């Protein structure tokens, strides 16, 4: 988070300057690549920003609801509070995504929306003990894996994906995770088109999907476990 606030401590800008002088430098290319999202397959330092946010949400919940419990709040009251907070986060996410545009952008893939979608489920794991929490995290990841595999993949390029890109990426079982040709993408093609839109939703350029909040819930639970440790 500190790195994000300080724009990567200037490393991205420094790497960019060095690459202008020595564009073939493998070292500075590797440094610069850490400040961009990985191209679907892979992971960079920049890709860890959202998991860091969601981990801290779980960490904060461990303290927040203990305080509320000590103040005499019932479980029902705290769950209602968690649901209201979740709705506010989702509404704020839509507002920020829409910006100054004339049409409301019903997109639920930014970090606030993803936290909001998983927040009530995270609360249900609060104060349940490490075993239940670990099982919940495993279930979130395991059910995601099963859903992707059962849905299957495609050897054809997904929406917004070129044939050349497709040929260089997912194959065999991994094809189930192909960009814009997987079960979460199929859900969004149905779900996001339930909202009023100027044109039908076809794909997300970055491959981000609403149901990403399910595996992301595991990261939030890990934060909760750390906070309760």
Stretches with model-predicted labels:
Residues 2-4, 121, 142, 223:
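Hydrophobic residues within the alpha-helical transmembrane core of Major Facilitator Superfamily
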Residues 25-34, 90-98, 191-200:
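Active-site-adjacent bridging/hinge elements
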Residues 50-66, 112-124, 214-229:
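Specific transmembrane alpha-helix
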Residues 47-52, 67-97, 103, 108-119, ...:
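Transmembrane alpha-helical segments and their boundary/interface "anchor" motifs
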Residues 131-218:
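Long hydrophobic alpha-helical segments that form multi-pass transmembrane helix bundles
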Residues 11, 67-72, 101-102, 149-160:
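Transmembrane helix-loop junctions in multipass membrane proteins, especially transporters and channels
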Residues 1-70, 74:
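N-terminal signal-anchor module of multipass membrane proteins
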